[in-house]
C-alpha cells in the first residue's frame, strides 16, 4: 500500500493538497529544531503517540509572551498579543479545513473538548435517546459517553471491532435509527495506529439517521491531513501537544449549526455580552464556549508551531516515521514469542507483546538503557480487552526519529530479553 494513501487520506484529497509544495523534508534537519534531542543525555524517544516533543519555536514564542505585558481582548496595550491569539484560530482553521475562525474553540485538551460536546448536548438526551461509540475508543470518548448515557437514561451502543480492529459498516447500520442523537468515532487508534474509515462511516450515518457525529482526532492530527468540511463531521476534537504544541491546550471545532446547539460547559467572564439581574445574554461563537481567562501562552505558542509546520512537507515527514515503524514490525516478526497487533494500513505505531513476559519488565529494562516507549493500557481498556491483553508495549515514531533510534531499540531489546530469559 502507498504510505501516502491510507483510507481517510485517499478520501480527503483536499487535505493532502495542503501539504504539497513545502520545503523538502530532511529528518536530520527536522530533528535539529527540537532542543531536547540535542541534549547529551536525551533518551531514545519512541513515545510520540503519548505526546510529541517540542520545537524551539514553541519555547521562543512562550517566553516572548511571558516577557510581555497584558492579556488579550482587554485593552489597547495588548493588541499585539490579541492579534497573535486570533491568528492562531485562523491557522487552526486552515490546518483542519474548518468553516471559519469562529468555529475554533479553545479547550484544555481533547478530553475537555469531548466533554464540552457531551455536556453541551445533554439537554437533547432522554430515556429514548441513543448514543453510539465503539471498542476502538480512547477513554476520553468511551468513559464520557458511557457516563452521560447513564446519567440521562439514554441507550448506549458499543460497536465491536473486527480482527483488523475496524468498525464493520453493517454493525453501525444495525444500530442507527431516528433516536440516535450522536455517534462518536475515533479516527486513529492510539493503541495500534489503525485508521478507521471515518469518511465512509459518516456517509452511512447521514443515510440512516439524523445523528450528530463527533470525531476524536487526537491521534490523527499529527498523522493525517484533515479537511473538516469534506469529512462532514459535526464536531472534531484534538490536543495541541500531539502536534508539537503545548500541554493544556486543545481544540473543539465543527459545523457552526452544531456548535450553536451546545450549552456552555462553563460559565463566567468573556462568554457573555450582557448581564443583569433579570437576563444574561451569551456571546456569539467562539467566545460563548470559552469562559474564563484562556490559555493565552499556549495559544500563542501553538500559533508559532503551526506557522513553523506550514514550511514542511508533512506527507513526506509522515512517510519517514511510517517507514521506521514498518521496519520495526518486520524485525519484530523474527523474535520468538513476539505477538504483533498490526493495523491494516501502514502506521507509525507498533503494538506488541512478548508472550510470557510482563510488559512492565521489558519497559523497565529498556528504560534503564535510555529507551522511552510505552507499556500499559494506553487509556483504552476495552480496546485491549478486544486484543485479549491487559497491557501491551507500544513504539510510536515521529519525523524527528532516525534509523539510529531503531537500531538502539533493538540492541536494548536484545539485552533485555537476554536478562529475562
Swiss-Prot record:
It holds the Pfam family Aminotran_5. Its cofactor is pyridoxal 5'-phosphate. Its EC number is 2.8.1.7. Gene3D superfamilies: Aspartate Aminotransferase, domain 1, Type I PLP-dependent aspartate aminotransferase-like (Major domain). Keywords: Pyridoxal phosphate, Transferase. The modification N6-(pyridoxal phosphate)lysine is found at residue 242. One of its GO terms (molecular function) is cysteine desulfurase activity. InterPro entries: Aminotrans_V_dom, Cysteine_dSase, PyrdxlP-dep_Trfase, PyrdxlP-dep_Trfase_major, PyrdxlP-dep_Trfase_small. The keyword Cell inner membrane does not apply. It catalyses: (sulfur carrier)-H + L-cysteine = (sulfur carrier)-SH + L-alanine. The keyword Chloroplast does not apply. It is an enzyme of class 2 (transferase). Catalyzes the removal of elemental sulfur and selenium atoms from L-cysteine, L-cystine, L-selenocysteine, and L-selenocystine to produce L-alanine. Belongs to the class-V pyridoxal-phosphate-dependent aminotransferase family. Csd subfamily. PANTHER family: CYSTEINE DESULFURASE, CYSTEINE DESULFURASE 1, CHLOROPLASTIC. This is Probable cysteine desulfurase. It comes from Pasteurella multocida (strain Pm70). The gene is csd.
